[in-house]
Amino acid sequence: MGSEALAYALRLLARKGYSRAALRAKLAARFGEAEAEAALGRLEAMGYLDDRAYARAFVETRARRYGPRKLRALLLARGVPEEVVEEVLPEARVEEALAVLRRYRHREDKARAVRFLEGRGFPLGVALEAWRLAQEEGEGYK
């Protein structure tokens, strides 16, 4: 009872990280609700399933490309509980937005650059400040 679900879950987790909700959906579709919950309980007890660790790793791997709003949306879409998301997300920093902006091809166009940063999840104020700093640094921004 549940050993097939547990083995399947371990195979999935060996390939990539999953949030509890995402793994629960996969297991429930294949084995049913009761077996899925039993397997998830065992995985959590063994330390193989942890939403906080998953969210931290997710943010670490994507923080260079996305701002906090985008990361928040991605984590919530993957079923990470909101309290965990709020705990692991960093505050939007102008330095991070500036680093992203430096890699952007159309950085000389203010409107495009700010829209780009907003699309990456940076708040408008942070995007504007990053653009202003880049302009002051004299990196060819207009």
UniProtKB/Swiss-Prot annotation:
Any one Gene Ontology cellular component term annotated for this protein: cytoplasm
Example of a GO biological process term: regulation of DNA repair
Signal peptide: none
Gene3D superfamilies associated with the record: Winged helix-like DNA-binding domain superfamily/Winged helix DNA-binding domain (1.10.10.10)
Pfam families in alphabetical order: RecX_HTH1, RecX_HTH2
Family, as annotated: Belongs to the RecX family.
UniProt protein name: Regulatory protein RecX
Species, as recorded: Thermus thermophilus (strain ATCC BAA-163 / DSM 7039 / HB27)
